[in-house]
Amino acid sequence: MASKVISATIRRTLTKPHGTFSRCRYLSTAAAATEVNYEDESIMMKGVRISGRPLYLDMQATTPIDPRVFDAMNASQIHEYGNPHSRTHLYGWEAENAVENARNQVAKLIEASPKEIVFVSGATEANNMAVKGVMHFYKDTKKHVITTQTEHKCVLDSCRHLQQEGFEVTYLPVKTDGLVDLEMLREAIRPDTGLVSIMAVNNEIGVVQPMEEIGMICKEHNVPFHTDAAQAIGKIPVDVKKWNVALMSMSAHKIYGPKGVGALYVRRRPRIRLEPLMNGGGQERGLRSGTGATQQIVGFGAACELAMKEMEYDEKWIKGLQERLLNGVREKLDGVVVNGSMDSRYVGNLNLSFAYVEGESLLMGLKEVAVSSGSACTSASLEPSYVLRALGVDEDMAHTSIRFGIGRFTTKEEIDKAVELTVKQVEKLREMSPLYEMVKEGIDIKNIQWSQH
């Protein structure tokens, strides 16, 4: 119960307008550091002037660091500054103990052994290490990888890199709801399949894959199963044993921890082998050489500890906000489509397409709300999302998609404001759309034969 009260208090603290309370009422120096002047008349951002700081609804790209995580990191920075790999003096031992405590915290969150946790720089490195590392180690007998068309770019690019080396890759399509066809997966497995890599929660559409069923299929065929769980840990219950995963990638900054640190779960029994990407001092059981980033690792552990305590409360809070956002938009707008399954979905992700609206114009018009049109790694591209195309979404609807990311510190007031601004901008753009006028008049625009010029 105490953690619920703390989380709610921090939510109010981080979103309360500047000037309405004094610094002495902050919970910590970390909370005080987040103080922002929301009363600024306007802010110039990349040549665009907006009225004050935008609302932050891009939690799949990254989350704000939890002040309690920051406090843990700050204390560690002051007191545990030794090299965790220095085994000859107290300062090294203190730093090593801090790292091992964090390793335990991460392991508990996913029901693993601390000896199965390898700290890395983030999920991208973990994905590269898993996909390339396994296939390189077993290259003499295993030449085939299975993944899906909706994976994160770093997994897809790792697979393409393997193809250039002579490996074969099967890119499974997904159903219109974003879920994997289990029979298609079963049929794709070959005697020389060395790895199946399927993400647990999709970063763009929030779809949660049937992990236990996928893991069971892989186990039946004795094929290692890797999952990118960057969007899953701390948000949905994760159990590596129930999922039958051999490798799992994780990231701290998706769960209110620091950027620059993540982990790869590497199963010990039955043992999975992989070739390291980097060579050096042999840290992290020889799988990831280099001096560990003690304070980031401490922050990762603290974030995992908080996630264990607050996941259920967070899920209920965020679910209510998701429903508030979706209902609020649909009450005032027609032609709003949810991309991806609503039955098997992480509640903090709401990917919506707005018919008869040009996507880039909608994003630019929503400059007072920090949202995205897809993955932060590819959102600079003007091409429609490859994830939505894989779902069979029409190109025009894929172009109009907006991903709303809701999190632990999001408030009802922010959701209401986001609804207001979104509805206002969509209505404005539709007023300028001749296609929308034709639809309102009952014309089926898909059957129109447009003249060639």
Swiss-Prot record:
Chief subcellular location: mitochondrion
Annotated residues for binding of pyridoxal 5'-phosphate: A123, T124, N203, Q231, S251, A252, H253, T291
Pfam families, per database record: Aminotran_5 (PF00266)
Transit peptide: 1-34
Subunit structure: Interacts with FH. Interacts with SUFE1.
PANTHER family: CYSTEINE DESULFURASE, CYSTEINE DESULFURYLASE FAMILY MEMBER
Family assignment from sequence similarity: Belongs to the class-V pyridoxal-phosphate-dependent aminotransferase family. NifS/IscS subfamily.
Protein name: Cysteine desulfurase, mitochondrial
Organism, as annotated: Arabidopsis thaliana (Mouse-ear cress)
Gene: NIFS1
